[in-house]
From Swiss-Prot:
Residues 1-21 form the signal peptide. Disulfide bonds: none annotated. The chain crosses the membrane at residues 451-471. Its cofactor is FAD. It is found in: Membrane. This is FAD-dependent monooxygenase aurC. GO terms for molecular function: FAD binding; monooxygenase activity.
Amino acid sequence: MGAYSFRVIIVGGSITGMTLAHCLDRAGIDYVILEKHKDIFAEPGISIGLMPNGSRILEQLGIYSDVHALFEGIKKIYQYMPDGYCIETDSPVNIVDRFGLPFCVIDRYQFLKVLYSKFEDKSRFHMNKKVTSICHGKSDVSVTTADGETYHGDLVVGADGVHSVVRSEMWRIGNLARPGFVTEREKSELAAEFACVFGVAKAVPGQGRWEHILRYNEDFCFMFFPASGTDVFFNVIYKLNQKYVYPDIPRFTKEEGIEVCESVGDFPVWEDVKFRDIWAQRIAFTCVPLEEHMFKNWHHRRIICVGDSVSKMSPNMGQGGNTAIESAAALTNGLRKLVTSNYPDKPSERQLSNTLETFNRNQFKRLNTVHGDARYVTRLEALDGTLKRVFARYVMGHCGDLLVGNLARIVAGGGVLDFIPLTARSGKDWPPCPWQHSWGISESIDFCKKFAVASLIVLIVVLARALDSPAGLSSGIRSSSWSF
């Protein structure tokens, strides 16, 4: 369409940044990517989950087939409680039946390689470009890097992660123009209560192909996914000894990751396999804090932040990367409409600001519930508190597809690139998923019946333990230590 007079400066060659670049490419909008590292590839061994809401956009971009080739299929999910009680579901199969696209887990390093390889013009990537400042001009915006280079454009997009320089510059500029644009209290809402050791291990001797296994434990959980061949991805998500707030969230060393993993080595994983057996076969791992928060203000003038820079969630729901892909598509939709409606002239800053405000408002509304769900699931799987312990052990297994149904609603509510026709694979024929359905299988009345039965079971268990306890009802739950 020839609308190359509008230029986007993307800061960060992340999954979010490269997905946005692919979207802009398809929309015919000019862009450049500034990456502070010498290359864009993450450390191997860190897994990322792809859900249908992210995969359908990759399919629109012609990327999904390459990504899918990296994926080892998952058919079942096994959720184990500390006492060995197991909830077995066919959720991965239900996802494919419902959406035509699977839930898959792949190596982030390999995913980034695929995204990068699909660019025909790699000259738009500029490596070793650490951003130091952003400045607004009369009709444009400029970005200066540590080596003294300056890049000019119409919009700066911060796709540079949770430690975003673009976000910091946006706050600085916003507070100069309007004191109180972002307060110290708002900044401190970005916090970490949990951390994770992400890793990948070779096959455990005698162990065949893996499925998705979740092991709930008090103050931590294990997550396992099939990797290439008989290799296995592992996540050890654990509660920190205190809540850390921005900017004082620590970064962890390999030694700290080793200490954590060795401390949980005797906990069971699957049949006779202990975690120490997997840890002994490790190929690569890293230990990181799990920051959580979504900021309300994502933009100021010609600056917008997307992905982890403004919407950071824990990995338990597997939606951080997928919702970032959604945001890249949604931002592109808005920019394309803005640019085409003003062509051949550039849109004014006010018009751009209105587009960014609409994008900000819609994405915040979309992700607010997802963030709440992710926070809850993280704490549920770490059995953080009596109510969550009771729900996980005595209620969840009797609620059918409740949690998976919630995932279905999240997936079905995602957006797409509105200027690329949908195919059957990218969700053209996805059936609606109203709130009272879960996977289109269980009606709300079925859930109510299941929940009533489960609640009765909980009541009976609590009363029975209370009657057996000399201390009475108050110790009925607290005394229920779970052991293997």
